[in-house]
């Protein structure tokens, strides 16, 4: 898929956040690439299109964050978002692949639509939270498995990707190797050492987001440490 191990930076600025506004995501992405990022992840159609137009010549993971009243699933949760993402031509489309109740179509229906309508270069990434999610995503033939939602679901809220010397990541890696799937470590890799560890353990790529591109998160980490 990709010949070398990649370091992705997630560049997102959502409505209500201080950095939300025109061209901000492109500037964040440019700064990330100047610092060594080899791939990008972003949300919302206008940002995806802007990064594609910027022609950074790196792989881009695109998502749409959309809340629905009857479900906790918000990362590219329905066919509506999938159709929009395919249309952008973004190389990697990531969707929530957890086994939680979805707002509309089933995960199977969304995946089936992707494989029937995708552009030839497009790949599908499963944002997972548990081993059950991973096994189901492999059964559905996702191209890429991500640990993105570990710690961000009700069932995994007391766990993280870095717990017990990266035990979850190691378990997912074994499954991915057995099934010849590309593994992206994402979710809570908030230090350079965490990111290096993920790649050293065997992940094909690592995504770092808040710890690089969200000043409020970085400031909060400092503040809490200072006041602990």
UniProtKB/Swiss-Prot annotation:
Gene Ontology terms: biological process: carbohydrate metabolic process; N-acetylmannosamine catabolic process; N-acetylneuraminate catabolic process
Function noted in UniProt: Converts N-acetylmannosamine-6-phosphate (ManNAc-6-P) to N-acetylglucosamine-6-phosphate (GlcNAc-6-P).
Gene name as annotated: nanE
Catalytic activity: an N-acyl-D-glucosamine 6-phosphate = an N-acyl-D-mannosamine 6-phosphate
NCBIfam families in the record: PRK01130.1
Family affiliation: Belongs to the NanE family.
PANTHER family, per the entry: N-ACETYLMANNOSAMINE-6-PHOSPHATE 2-EPIMERASE-RELATED
Lineage: Bacteria, Bacillati, Mycoplasmatota, Mycoplasmoidales, Metamycoplasmataceae
Native source species: Mycoplasmopsis pulmonis (strain UAB CTIP)
HAMAP family, per database record: ManNAc6P_epimer
Biochemical pathway: Amino-sugar metabolism; N-acetylneuraminate degradation; D-fructose 6-phosphate from N-acetylneuraminate: step 3/5
This protein's name: Putative N-acetylmannosamine-6-phosphate 2-epimerase
A GO term from the CC aspect: cytosol
